[in-house]
Amino acid sequence: FKRFFKNKTLNRLVLASVLLAFAQSLTGGLFVIFMDSILELGDYASRAIFVNFTFAVIGIFLWRYISLKYTKHFAASLCLLYAGILFLLQFFVVLYISDASETVKAGVLFFILAMYGISFSGAAPLIISMVADVSDAEEAESDINKSGAMFAYYTTITKVGYTFAVAFPYIFLESVIGFDISLGSDNSQFTK
């Protein structure tokens, strides 16, 4: 297990996975608050998540195709760039539509979530596939199959990203910003 800490390629993939886990869990953890408190579309939250995950399934085929045509690294990088641009773009769109009717806000939101959903399924499977490649290279070098231990190492450390993403935003919102989750859209304009 100690040898994994010295494997730079594996640790880069683990770091990428931790950051991805944090980012995806952070957006997921804050989604209901965002829908209810910011957009005041709480009734649409479950349908919006359904749209997001439906397009995530569709996205699997796109990212697999790109990874086969080019490389896994390129496909994962492109996927993360695409997700990052859409994530930033959505903030400007939300500011633009904040005073629109409920129907317009819901329609625009569903479109953005569909486009963002395409990226949701891309990077994680590609990173796991690259970890499998590292495991195969390690086995070829040492003639010992360590794939189980390597994936245990990868999965355990990746869970750190999920853990921080669940705890950090709520602590920050309540302790630093003063946002009260129980108030929903009745929070002050500053805390929203």
Predicted regions span which residues?
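Membrane-embedded alpha-helical bundles of multi-pass transporters/translocases
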Residues: 1-192
